[in-house]
Each structure stands twice: as structure tokens, then as C-alpha cells.
Amino acid sequence: MTSPLRIALVAGEASGDILGSGLMRALKARHPDVRFIGVGGPLMEAEGMQSYFPMERLSVMGLVEVLGRLRELLARRKLLVQTLIDEKPDVFIGIDAPDFTLNIELQLRRAGIKTVHYVSPSVWAWRQKRVLKIREGCDLMLTLLPFEARFYEEKGVPVRFVGHPLADTIPLESDRGATRAELGLSVDGPVVALMPGSRGGEVGRLGALFFDAAERLLVERPGLRFVLPCASPQRRAQVEQLLQGRDLPITLLDGRSHVALAACDAVLIASGTATLEALLYKRPMVVAYRMAPLTFWVLKRLVKSPYVSLPNLLAQRLLVPELLQDDATPEALARTLLPLIEDGHAQTEGFDAIHRILRRDASNQAADAVLSLLGLPLSL
């Protein structure tokens, strides 16, 4: 190729900015004159992204917020598609944010531009008909998890499993003692991490439940200590309110979920992406979740997977206990977690095997997959 390689990327949130910057760095190592255009956050801009508008304009969550910004989002997407068709990049890479990026990929592919989607939406679990749109709009799907790749292979979508960047970042073994010393916790006494979620609704539904379970654990193990990472100042205030009137020996952290996990012996955790982090730190866990009864009723009928937590989806078996809705009682949570504080070997052995599968140098794998799609050498 005589002219410099031009790659368009769009990320819609902070996690996508992290993935995008790693991919850009790996691509630059192979093709130093590559030019990047599209939409990215500060990390992608630091790697040389010429962002058409701030990524924050795409970072919306929740139905109400999306509806309030729908006109702006649709207008930005329309303008972005036209700009990219005019620019004719060698490839477009949509990073996560499927409700925004999949439509862009479809239109660009119809215009003759190669397209890649990085991070699979949860089509294997529900709304499986979305795979038809993915197959039509996507030249290549890059997945972080192996079971996702198997799903796409069965559906006839070109796919490459690249591994998970978290598995590259988190060491195979972590230093529990050093982390406890950093937090001023005893090296010898048992510590349980409580992780009721990062959103206000999750903490509202699970916070008091987790604290009730913690009080029952404390009766059985009087020397027990607890640690809870708060995702934001708002969540910390919410947690402090829920703790009023309780006498739990608990250390609250501002963010730093990795510190809480490195320090603990076991974790009581909300179902979600944090369970993957707990798995990678090899911490035995009990997964719990509660949602509005109607939401639970609807999801039970829509979701095709037998499991809800990532550890079980990755293991393809019931590796960690899942206590959902009415099954998630303080007594059941405490009773299920208690033996894991002493011996979670059956879980952690499985966690280690999964960590090694996911640890594939994801950014470099993704860069090689993109260059192979373009028929370019993997290095100059």
C-alpha cells in the first residue's frame, strides 16, 4: 500500500477507550505511519486519534437518558456515517457500544468499507436475531471470550477470539499480604469483599441484603473483616447511609475494586463484569442478584443461557453459586459463602485455567486480526 494506512474507530465509553488505545498502540508498532480518525476518549486521543467530537456525547446509560438524547445521537451517527463514507478509511472498527456502532458498520460495509466489531454484544444470551444484522454489517467480529467465538462460528460470522485485556493486566498470582498491609488489615485474619454493584439501583437492591449476610457471617466467624469498593462518591454516600445503625468491621474504598479483591479471601458479589475481575484474582465467590419482579419475569423468558454469571458462562458449568431473586436471602448468602472463606480451591483451580485461556495479549491479537483482514503484513 503506497498511501499511509487510515483506520477509523468509534468508542462510546471509558472501557472502549481503554480497548481502543491498546489496539491503536499495537497497530502503530506494526505500521508507524498509520492515521486514526473517528471518535475516542482521552486515551485514544493520546495515541493519535483525531476525534470528530468528544466521546462523552455518546456515553449515555438508561432508557430515560437515551430517549432524552435520542435526536442528538441519531444526528451524530448520520453525520459520522457520511463523513466516514467521504473519508473512505481502509477499515472501520466499532468498539463495543453496539446500539450505536452496529448500524454504522452496516452502512459503511454497504458503501464498500471493511468493518470490524470489537467486543461482542450479548447476542448469545438474548435478542439472538441481532446476529443477522452483525453478519450483514461486519467483516470480522473480535471477541474477548471464547464461548462468544464459538457462537459466531455456528452462525457463520467471521470471528477471532483475541482474549481479554484484563487477563493480560492482572497477574496470574497476586500478593494478598502486601495489599492487606496497604489497607491496614491483618495479614492473618479472614477478609470478605462485598461488591453489591456500581449503579445506584443495584446498591439499593443488594446493599442491605449483603450487609445482613455479613452480620450473619460475623456471628459464625467473629474475627472476620469486610472491605467494600465504592464505584463513585454517590455510591459511597449511599453505602454509608445503608451502614448507619450497623456495627460491621468494614473498610470502604474509593474505587479500587482490584485492591479489595487482592486483599480478600472470598467475595460476595453482584452478577456483572466485576465477577470476571474476581475470577482473575482467583477469589472464591458467591454471585447474587435481585431486580424488579417484572424485569426478572421477562428476562427469564428471553435469556437463552442456563447461567447468568461470567465465571459459569466461561466454565460452561456451575463453577460458582448463583443466588437470584427470592433465593438471594441473607441466610442463604452467608451459608453458601462461609465454607468458601476456608477453602475455595475447587473454584480457584477453575479460575486459574480460565485466566490462562483469556491471557492472549489481546491488543496485539486484535491488531494482527485487523491487518490480516486487510491483507497487510503483520509487521514492517
Swiss-Prot record:
Kindly tell me the pathway this chain contributes to: Bacterial outer membrane biogenesis; LPS lipid A biosynthesis
Q: Which InterPro entries does the annotation name?
A: Glyco_trans_19
Top enzyme category = transferase
A GO molecular-function descriptor: lipid-A-disaccharide synthase activity
Which GO annotations describe the biological process of this protein? lipid A biosynthetic process
Question: Could you tell me what this protein does?
Answer: Condensation of UDP-2,3-diacylglucosamine and 2,3-diacylglucosamine-1-phosphate to form lipid A disaccharide, a precursor of lipid A, a phosphorylated glycolipid that anchors the lipopolysaccharide to the outer membrane of the cell.
**Homology family:** Belongs to the LpxB family.
Q: What protein name does the entry list?
A: Lipid-A-disaccharide synthase
Q: What is the lineage of its organism?
A: Bacteria, Pseudomonadati, Pseudomonadota, Gammaproteobacteria, Pseudomonadales
